[in-house]
C-alpha cells in the first residue's frame, strides 16, 4: 500500500467526519491535498517501507533485511580485528625490543601530552627531567665533627670538653678541609686522647717537634774536659815549686843563722816586693788612703 493511497484514505475519512460537523472541511480539503502533494514541500522523515532507514523511526517495526545487515556488520568486525592484530603485535614487539626504543616512546608520549595540555616550556623541561634516569648517589666519606649544608658547603664544629658547648670552626669547600680543622682543634683541647679523622698527620708532627726540641737543647757545647784538667794540673805545679823554694830557704836560714847577711831576709824582701807590685797592678784593688 503506497503512501498516496494511505493519504487518500485519510482524506476520505476526514471528509466523512467533516460532513458530520459541517461543510467547511469539504471546502478546504482540496487545498490541503495540493499542499501535501506539492513537490516544493519536503517529504516527512518517514518514507516508504522499501527504504531501510524508514524502519528506524518505528520501534515496533522489525525488518529481516535490517537484521541481516547488522549481522553482516558484526561479522566484519572480528575480521578487521584479526587483520589488525599482527601489525599491533609487531609494533609491541618493536617497542619492547630495546630500552632505547622504550625511552623514545616515552619521549613521544611526553611530547604528545605536553602539546595537548598546552604546557609552558618550563613545564616541558620539568617533564623531560622527571623522565630521565636518576643518577646513582655517590655517598662521600663522613668525618667526625663535619656536616654538609643544603647548598653544598661543609661546616665543622666541636664541643668543648668541660662545658659541652659548641665551638664553631668555620665553613669550607671540601669535607677534608673541615675534617682537618676539627682535628687541629680537637688535638689542642684533648691532646692524645682526642679521636681524630687523620691521626697520622698529628702523631708524625709531634714526634718531629720532639726531635727538633731535643736537638736544640743539645746545641750549647760544654767546655772540653781535657782543657780543664790541664789548667787544674798546671796551677798546683806552680804552687808546689814555690812551696819547695820557700822550704829550702827556711832550711838554709836555719842552718846558716839568723844574721843580717842570711839569705832569708833577701827572700822576704823579694816576696814583699812581689806582693806590693801585684796589688798595685790589679784593677780590682783599691789604693790605700793616707792616714794623715
UniProtKB/Swiss-Prot annotation:
Residues 271-285 have a biased composition (Low complexity). Residues 14-51, 207-238, 265-292 are annotated as: Disordered. Pfam families: AP2 (PF00847). It comes from the Eukaryota. Gene3D superfamilies: AP2/ERF domain. SMART domains: AP2. Residues 207-221 have a biased composition (Basic and acidic residues). Its main location: nucleus. Residues 142-199 bind DNA. It is found in: Nucleus. Keywords: Activator, DNA-binding, Ethylene signaling pathway, Nucleus, Transcription, Transcription regulation. One of its GO terms (biological process) is ethylene-activated signaling pathway. One of its GO terms (molecular function) is DNA-binding transcription factor activity. One of its GO terms (cellular component) is nucleus. Belongs to the AP2/ERF transcription factor family. ERF subfamily. Probably acts as a transcriptional activator. Binds to the GCC-box pathogenesis-related promoter element. May be involved in the regulation of gene expression by stress factors and by components of stress signal transduction pathways. This is Ethylene-responsive transcription factor ERF054. The gene is ERF054.
